[in-house]
């Protein structure tokens, strides 16, 4: 039998008694107890030096533990995890450092993980599905703050009084700074535009706004995907960028932020929309000023973000080349051409468009630098058709509405 059997101390004593009997081979005694000769001689030596008491296993605990985590660190770690349930070891470690603990006192990521598991504050995750293939569309990279903003609506939920709460979220792609987190009553253009006017007034203008293809940001049927809201953005010099339909992973960082919001706010809704709006603003401030991000070197977004140098009041009207005919689009989306009404799009209502004459019978319609269609003479009237693909904006030296420099 081996030392792993029950009553190991008694077995060791039995081995000592047999091995010390006259005429008994030490090797035979070791084979009888199914232990190695090295182990047998070790216990014989211990018995000779200390008697029966020496046969008890000594503590394997080190005499000193220079890397042992202090109680203060463990208490603070558990407190932070309890307050921020979905933050992992990397972010918790960064938060400990930001709270004044020295780097020598803060444990490694592996140790933090063990502490969380032993405290019942962590679950072992199973192997996830393989990631989807990333898109290959020409999405802009953000080299600095305000290069690209992402926008979306967080899926709605009901407050405890039964009212619908659907936050509009605007986020800086480079710094992860959450510029806006505000419930809207409906996805109406006027209401959303008012929010953007406030955000533009506070933070300036981005170079690009990236959205999905949903209203009021974009339209799958409108010319160049324009809506009244995105047409206004373009008049401010903001480039429009849209992810492919059905591919939210192209806006992955924004979606992950929505996931955090769902777990930490939506799961326990407030009593009213007004109370929820206050909670959302507190969450936004915490997200920007307290939550470190690995991609930012464990800095918080507020340490990286700065407002844009391109201000809302700096935007000037787009100027078309001198040989273009200019028309003001009516609210209903129509223009007048040689006394006849031609429908373009309600998205362009009250905006100015430029008509480039391609021939006596055809004019290309430009909205800023976007070719939104062509008007073709058809008998005694005019019809509109899509613009030829890959139309390049006409060269002009008089256009004061360049892409924003942020």
Predicted features and spans:
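Acidic/histidine-rich, metal-coordinating catalytic segments
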Residues: 200-223, 244-246, 251, 300-301
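Short, amphipathic alpha-helical "recognition" segments used to contact nucleic acids or chromatin
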Residues: 7-24, 74-83
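Mobile genetic element proteins and their domesticated derivatives, centered on retroelements
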Residues: 15, 29, 40-43, 51, ...
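Mobile-element integrase/transposase regions
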Residues: 114-177, 185, 189-207, 234-235, ...
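C-terminal, beta-rich DNA-binding module of retroviral/retroelements integrases
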Residues: 288-406
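Basic, flexible linker segments flanking DNA-binding modules
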Residues: 52-150, 156, 227-230, 300-312
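Short, Lys/Arg-enriched anionic-surface-contact patches
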Residues: 1-14, 63-71
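Charged alpha-helix within mobile-element recombinases
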Residues: 228-313, 354, 358-359
